[in-house]
Amino acid sequence: MNIQEEIKKRRTFAIISHPDAGKTTITEQLLYFGGEIREAGTVKGKKTGTFAKSDWMDIEKQRGISVTSSVMQFDYDGKRVNILDTPGHEDFSEDTYRTLMAVDAAVMVVDSAKGIEAQTKKLFEVVKHRGIPVFTFMNKLDRDGREPLDLLQELEEILGIASYPMNWPIGMGKAFEGLYDLYNQRLELYKGDERFASLEDGDKLFGSNPFYEQVKDDIELLNEAGNEFSEEAILAGELTPVFFGSALTNFGVQTFLEIFLKFAPEPHGHKKTDGEIVDPYDKDFSGFVFKIQANMDPRHRDRIAFVRIVSGEFERGMSVNLPRTGKGAKLSNVTQFMAESRENVTNAVAGDIIGVYDTGTYQVGDTLTVGKNKFEFEPLPTFTPEIFMKVSAKNVMKQKSFHKGIEQLVQEGAVQLYKNYQTGEYMLGAVGQLQFEVFKHRMEGEYNAEVVMSPMGKKTVRWIKPEDLDERMSSSRNILAKDRFDQPVFLFENDFALRWFADKYPDVELEEKM
């Protein structure tokens, strides 16, 4: 195997969207083209009992939303494609943000009836901050939606990125006839046996359709006043190619995939803490853990650390350094994924995502290196929780399961754990309410540990240096606690309590996370 050629084939990207824009459906269709599934399951399968291939966790199947980031791999057109399907629900932004650190491009799925929604905007900001290319798929043309020109204008105004339509819809909803493919200079037909037709046949096929005249006018306008196509601007994250289609009816998806693979970037390097970038073609293996997931196989109570390979080649059984602990580890039980199925992998290269079987060795953000290399990659973003709950085991006899469950789910980063300095009580922190629901559901379903949870409301969280801490600083307006790394932290009841503390202890420096 020529490693350099293998690395060149890799295309690793995440799919981002607002909930219900059709993200999981398009993932299914891409897997279908990659030959990984025989038929694309549909997310709304609550009545039929069929569930999306990429939504494997029990609570996701019940609710029809993605709450964990799945990783799936397939080969297509000479490329090895790694898709990371991110949680669409806003409460899981933490997991999504970390996932976006592990990819080289993003595909943004937009509901053409709704346009740019709040969650899409949030996720786009992260992608923009990273400077990676964004490809846009305007979905659900099988339903009535907004005017395509309006959608492009909104995209540019709200997200502040230039756009270039690769195709243009001919009608929509019941009147949807197909796509005018600007990039390939052909028509893609929605109805009938033929898939494509030449542009010259347009008047013959759609002459009586008022939509077709509008399409020709729109395209003339785009040619005169639209943005110029620039591969350089796409790779710099300054121009997003826009594709129209319908994931549900699998229309326009294959054309999108083929053009996407042509322009999506090869694996990029990753920054170390000293600012130097590790090149993917460096011969020495390196990677970082961007996610930990417990119980991917509930029968075995297992934990998988997801690793993005940054440079070199992974070989089964290799020894790696874990600079955070100063210790080493052996990578013998390693898998690659297709949602709920996995297979052991003997080697993988820069750009690939591998799953390392974990018995508690790894933490999110860990760097893996080989030989004399002991550097660390720049830290992944961490988030300050906004709402809190006290948590305890309902059954005193189940303390062992309770502690194991909390330890594993907290290491995943699904919720954050704090311990009251004075009472030793456990408190959970989260960005949104759904995280608590998922935590409770998984504690009961996966660890057989029922929990009692009582709301504490919103808190303003600040960390304090251990050397500055005096336990007398604790008052009725704050709770002194330790985080899971035993670092002291104050949970203030509101901003007023925080300001009061800052006035009283002007020399004490309080730290806020993202």
Swiss-Prot record:
UniProt-annotated binding residues for GTP: 17-24, 85-89, 139-142
Position of the signal peptide: none
UniProt source species: Streptococcus pneumoniae (strain CGSP14)
Sample GO molecular function, one term: GTPase activity
A Pfam family: EF-G_D2
Descriptive protein name: Peptide chain release factor 3
InterPro entries assigned to the protein according to its UniProt record, in alphabetical order: EF-G-like_DII (IPR053905), EFG_III/V (IPR035647), G_TR_CS (IPR031157), P-loop_NTPase (IPR027417), PrfC (IPR004548), RF3_C (IPR032090), RF3_dom_3_sf (IPR038467), RF3_GTP-bd (IPR041732)
Biological process according to GO: regulation of translational termination
GO cellular component: a single term: cytosol
Main location: cytoplasm
tr-type G domain sequence ranges: 8-268
Localization in the cell: Cytoplasm
Function description: Increases the formation of ribosomal termination complexes and stimulates activities of RF-1 and RF-2. It binds guanine nucleotides and has strong preference for UGA stop codons. It may interact directly with the ribosome. The stimulation of RF-1 and RF-2 is significantly reduced by GTP and GDP, but not by GMP.
Keywords for the protein's UniProt record, in alphabetical order: Cytoplasm, GTP-binding, Nucleotide-binding, Protein biosynthesis
Family per record: Belongs to the TRAFAC class translation factor GTPase superfamily. Classic translation factor GTPase family. PrfC subfamily.
CDD domains the record matches: RF3, RF3_III
PROSITE patterns reported for this sequence: G_TR_1, G_TR_2
